Amino acid sequence: MADMKVPALAGLKSVPPLTNPIVISDVHLAPNRPALMTAFLKFLERIAPRYAELVVTGDLFDYWLGDDAMLGPDASADVDAIVSSLRLYTSNGHRTLIMPGLHDCLLGRDFTDACGAELVADPIVINVMGTSVLFSHGAQWCTKDEALQAYRAVVTSPQWQSSVLRLPAGERAKMFGEAWKAASESHPEEISDKDRDIVESAAAESARAAGAQIVLHGHTHRPGAHVNAMIERWTLPDWNIDPETQHNKSGWITFLEGGRPQIQLF
């Protein structure tokens, strides 16, 4: 039986309404991306405080080998800085909701507790200024990408997470690699870039089942609004700050009065 503390089981399934949130996704923080780290810390200091709540819909980190491995005495200076900045944000009266993604699916309650944040389940319906919004990382709706779905089924499994978190930290990255190798080998066929995107009917069905008016997600790195007869779906931008290539981008979604999303790209 899986430990209830594993991230796959630990996320809150309901939370109080949001009054004025800013939402980000796919920041992919990592030690080898110092410019990205600096940009994120500036965001927490200068942009996020303008809003009542910060919501992260997955992949805040490019990898996360478990709270026990990434926090505490062995924590990197980067992780310490992120925890301190998030804790300062929440201690100043803001709420922070963090959802694990695929890259950081082992992000758990110890991390969010250290930040004063809330770990939330994927997906989760939240009332935003009177509008019912389904928040998700979004990977589960890329249903034509069978290798991705096979990999996701493994690494988000409570049983797999429980077994991996029992291993020494140094062995955990190998387990992710083996899971991806097995998924790729079981589904070796090439698929188009289009088929790696969200399948509208899959997202729409989740929204209907949850009673949500709007879907908001990350994962695909294809920011924009997608409105059709089935669904109103908003895709969050990813972050990429690279001084060498000058390939710099970031962004977020905020809400107008009445819970209408608006996307901001930089």
PLM regions: where:
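Short charge-dense sequence patches
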Residues: 27-40, 147-157
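Short C-terminal domain-edge/linker segments immediately following a structured domain
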Residues: 52-57, 86-90, 128-131, 163-170, ...
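Core catalytic region of metal-dependent phosphoesterases/phosphodiesterases
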Residues: 2-8, 12, 17-20, 29-128
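Conserved beta-sheet core of the metallophosphoesterase superfamily
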Residues: 114-122, 132-134, 139, 144-150, ...
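Active-site neighborhood of phospho(di)ester-bond hydrolases with catalytic His/Asp-centered motifs
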Residues: 23-25, 54-58, 95-102, 135-136, ...
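Generic beta-strand structural signal
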Residues: 23, 56, 127-128, 226-227, ...
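Active-site-proximal loop/helix segment associated with metal-binding centers of metalloenzymes
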Residues: 136-199
